């Protein structure tokens, strides 16, 4: 509207949604770190558990498994835990998939993965933990790639003295 354009010069801060605004909106798996099993086995378990989920991170994991032609396991039970992750049953075993808080709340030691999670998070990646019963199997990092134009646009805002805040 004309009124919005007239007041635009007063803007001090721009708040942007990350997914689809700054990024492509298509997360991809960037790192797979396993403990006691192969990376492909971890990806098989992870994709199997994530298959019923509609979360964009689940889609990235499933796509990574499909690219490697990994056959998925059958999932018997599937429970989404809001803000935490998923609890599922496969081959008679309880599988946990989610953030560190979910692992902590279920008494699952992250077995030295905290430093790796911190490093990956600092790179702008989202880290998901996977555990079977009470044993951590590994972590998978997922990242949404920034759009080609995002850096230049943010630089332009900063040149104009406008702060940029990203919501995630």
What annotation goes with each model-predicted range?
Residues 2-168:
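Cytosolic catalytic headpiece
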